[in-house]
């Protein structure tokens, strides 16, 4: 988004965590310090950064702040916005209640709940439904506009009953997603291994991504179709060893390749090497990885869920299934037995992805920015005018 807005003639400054690793930053990037330790899942925690960000902002002529996380850096953004009279936009990227288990006490409660502990389950449910939602309500009210990446997330936010306007602004796809990659042929040859089909998925290897379901699903398919496919899992995370062990238990370890982290510019080559993109997560707000796959003419086979259903049209650019292993396996087998339908889906997938190219999305977001800035300035002028205007006081007659 920053690159496309710059292409349109705007100055965009990025404030991002310092990962303590070599990066080639430009003059528009500011790195704020983070704690040395990371919570589970390799998520960096911003340190006390208000003073650092405030000092940097004070030297820049900023018209608008767009923040992407509601905690810590989000509070810094709204505080600075209020102090400098700058409107603040927030994009609701994540179903935060589904990521509580990365914090140690809630991870402990999650384990207890999984073991059938009713007290742990009750406390966790209270935290998800009350603590998280109340915090988000408070934060969203401090913002001047909220972007939801999909219509389903916009609807999800309606029960929050906030006065802040909510607009739909999906994440755009960079040009590299639509390019042809010569490496795709070599990747397919390496991993297909004389099988008939090659599937892939791109995901953090974490519990909320539901990859254990995916492995059980492909195991069920193998039992019915035989050894006719391989699966590439791109990504890394805390569940990797557990997933490898599960693939061995299910006797599909020779069909599943854990590729690990792949750089963004190479992911499209893996997409182009495959026949179908498998997706099992039920915690997405948009599912940008689905659109990236579609850009490479790759149909998506996914569980019907928030975010996913906004981009996957069942039977057109992919297939949506329930989270029943039996139904999931049956639906996948049905696709594979209808190659003409699969070919048609490839074209529709590409057409869908083209609607999300970065340039189009940047123009859409720019319109929202302009509208917000104009309305914010009008409201600020009115408040300043009211505060500075003195009104005659009429003496009360007795």
Residue ranges, per PLM feature:
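Conserved donor-binding/catalytic core segment of Leloir-type glycosyltransferases
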Residues: 192-218
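Nucleotide-activated donor-binding/catalytic signature segment of Leloir-type glycosyltransferases, i.e.
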Residues: 242-262
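N-terminal subdomain of nucleotide-sugar transferases
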Residues: 1-33, 366, 370, 381, ...
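Short alpha-helical donor nucleotide-sugar binding micro-motif in glycosyltransferases
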Residues: 261-262, 269-274, 365
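Conserved acidic donor-binding segment of nucleotide-sugar-dependent glycosyltransferases
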Residues: 314-315, 319-326, 334-340, 354
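Donor nucleotide-sugar binding/catalytic pocket of nucleotide-sugar-dependent glycosyltransferases
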Residues: 16, 117-182, 193
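Aromatic "clamp/platform" in nucleotide-sugar-dependent glycosyltransferases that forms part
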Residues: 282
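Short hydrophobic beta-strand element within catalytic cores of glycosyltransferases
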Residues: 299-302
